[in-house]
Amino acid sequence: CGVETENPTQWFADVIDRRYDAYREWALKYMCEAPEEVLWRRWLAYDCDPERIRKNAAELCYQYRQTKGRRTVVEGGAETVKELCRRGYTMGIISDLVGKREVDEWLDQDGLRPYFQTVQQSSVTYVRKPGPAIYYYAMEEVGAEPENCCFVGDNLNRDIIGAKAVDFGMTVTVQYKKNKPLKLTAENRPDAKIYRFPDLLDIFPKRGQVAVEKLIPPEDGQ
């Protein structure tokens, strides 16, 4: 992007990560995701050649995400998604990942695209969680009513708050680390929690049904 440095990896960590923190504050404040070109020209590489940034913004986003590690499906995740689909549930994704490429690439590489009837990305809609609009986009695409929806997420302050803001009928958080207590508040408190993604199969036996007796209160074990 027009910068000369003896250690590009270190420069990237020292400069771009710091600038991204400032961008993230803005994004969370306004519940907005900036277009890829704007992200780099306004926040991350404003002192670089603007024309080169414009041409390479999408690739820069993708490579920046790769420095954070490749996203992989959680253990039992693919099998759980396929089984829930077989049981008749309509499923979707609402993602706040930066860049337009990563989610689509992941869905195609893992063969999971056919199992999701809506995929909403803040990098496409420019609306991010917990902003209510992106949840409405998802419901509108599949023709769902909020009272018939359940949101499953691992971030209380984005996933759960947003789902509750649009009156989802149910919210479930994933507590992957049992020994790390959830930081619950009245606003982000989900209806239940699970410790493993496949635990969803115990909760949702059949479309239109919830096994209430299988629900684990979010305070359990805290």
Predicted regions and their residues:
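Asp-based, Mg2+/Mn2+-dependent phosphohydrolase catalytic module
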Residues: A78, K82-E83, T90, I94-Q222
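N-terminal helical cap/lid subdomain that shapes the substrate entry/recognition surface
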Residues: C1-E75, E79-K82, R86-R87
